């Protein structure tokens, strides 16, 4: 799963660089168009990664263990991870875009809001004894909360400031 995060983080780095360059050149309209294109690439790459992970879920866990109890827990968790990937692709891109735009203050506040959503979900999993798959489902709630806060910011356009 860390390997997927590294691949998605590469999209964030590209988003930072391209956004900084485009806004630095004073091209707000081009930056917005570039952002939409990168969001599509993020969703597409995340979707492809999710499908690959989904197709390989029964085999991936076997690379690490033969213990039947671990395999029984791992495969549904890997499926949950796979479902999250398309959302994660867009989240990573928008993180990069907003970092490249110098919108760190918004990202900090959005992070607190996301934590306010995720913490009860994660604690609830532990309290209810939900197990590994439900912990990944809770993490999906974290990703969804991040996606919503980032898309709201992308749509309002206040991040696209030249000369910042």
Where is each model-derived feature located?
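Alpha-helical transmembrane segments of multi-pass membrane proteins
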Residues: 2-4, 68-94, 120
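Membrane-embedded alpha-helical transmembrane segments of multi-pass integral membrane proteins
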Residues: 49, 88-91, 145-149
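Small-residue-rich hydrophobic transmembrane alpha-helices
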Residues: 1-51, 55, 91-102, 106
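Transmembrane helix-loop junctions in multipass membrane proteins, especially transporters and channels
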Residues: 14, 58-67, 97, 101-104, ...
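Short membrane-interface helical motifs at transmembrane helix boundaries
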Residues: 48-75
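Residue-level recognition of transmembrane alpha-helices
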Residues: 42, 78-81, 85, 111-112, ...
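Membrane-interface helix-loop junctions in multi-pass transport and translocation proteins
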Residues: 72, 115-148, 152, 156-163
């Amino acid at each position: 799963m860390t390997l997927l995060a590294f691949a998605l983080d590469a999209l964030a780095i590209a988003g930072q660089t391209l956004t900084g360059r485009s806004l630095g050149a004073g091209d707000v309209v081009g930056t917005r168009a570039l952002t939409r294109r990168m969001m599509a690439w993020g969703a597409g790459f995340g979707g492809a990664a999710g499908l690959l992970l989904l197709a390989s879920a029964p085999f991936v866990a076997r690379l690490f263990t033969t213990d039947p109890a671990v395999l029984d827990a791992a495969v549904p968790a890997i499926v949950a991870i796979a479902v999250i990937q398309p959302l994660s692709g867009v989240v990573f891109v928008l993180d990069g875009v907003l970092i490249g735009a110098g919108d760190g203050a918004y990202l900090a506040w959005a992070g607190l809001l996301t934590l306010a959503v995720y913490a009860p979900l994660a604690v609830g999993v532990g309290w209810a004894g939900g197990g590994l798959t439900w912990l990944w489902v809770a993490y999906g709630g974290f990703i969804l909360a991040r996606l919503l806060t980032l898309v709201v910011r992308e749509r309002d356009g206040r991040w696209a400031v030249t000369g910042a």
